[in-house]
Regions:
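Residue-level signal for functionally critical sites in structured catalytic/ligand-binding pockets
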Residues: 14-19, 26-30, 34-37, 64-75, ...
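HotDog/MaoC-like acyl-thioester-processing domains
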Residues: 68, 72-77, 85-157
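A generic structural signal for short beta-strands and their flanking turns/coil linkers
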Residues: 5-9, 36-37, 55-64, 74-80, ...
Length: 157
């Protein structure tokens, strides 16, 4: 996995995200990565989940791979490194899928020389752009990525 990431949201681990030992549950790691995806689109003015005419268009997940390297702890300063990878027929031009790579790092301690960065997790997931019927609760069809989404992704992919 390349280490060239362009979008790096930061926050601190909240008490509610931990167990009694102060360790973050693994499901939070995936939530942090997904929140970074949402922030990525929001920062670019793209509404990546829309409802119009009773139809929802968004990105259901079709594949996920994650490696949990070290535990995250209460009050760790977390940096989520995320980047999109367009996939499809013409290098993204006619694609319906987006893959995302992520690395989550905790900055810990301050021993006078700064913080130590500890890798918490890394992984990748793939989503497809699809349309669902909200009333019926069914996936209707996979659609080509809209041009505005391809533009938002292409400068970082």
């Amino acid at each position: 996995m390349k280490e060239k990431f362009h979008f790096l949201p930061e926050f601190r681990v909240r008490f509610a995200e931990t167990d009694m030992a102060g360790v973050v549950h693994f499901s939070q790691i995936l939530r942090w990565a997904e929140n970074a995806e949402s922030d990525f689109f929001r920062c670019r003015g793209v509404d990546f989940a829309t409802v119009a005419g009773g139809k929802l268009r968004g990105f259901p997940r079709v594949k996920l791979q994650a490696e949990f390297v070290a535990p995250a702890r209460y009050d760790d300063r977390i940096v989520v490194k995320i980047r999109p990878l367009l996939s499809g027929r013409d290098g993204g031009e006619k694609s319906s899928a987006i893959s995302w790579e992520f690395v989550i790092v905790a900055a810990r301690g301050d021993n006078g020389g700064g913080c130590d960065n500890v890798e918490i997790a890394r992984g990748r997931w793939t989503s497809v752009y699809a349309e669902a019927d909200v009333a019926a609760g069914t996936l209707r069809r996979v659609r080509e990525l809209p041009a505005e989404i391809v533009r938002a992704l292409s400068e970082f992919a």
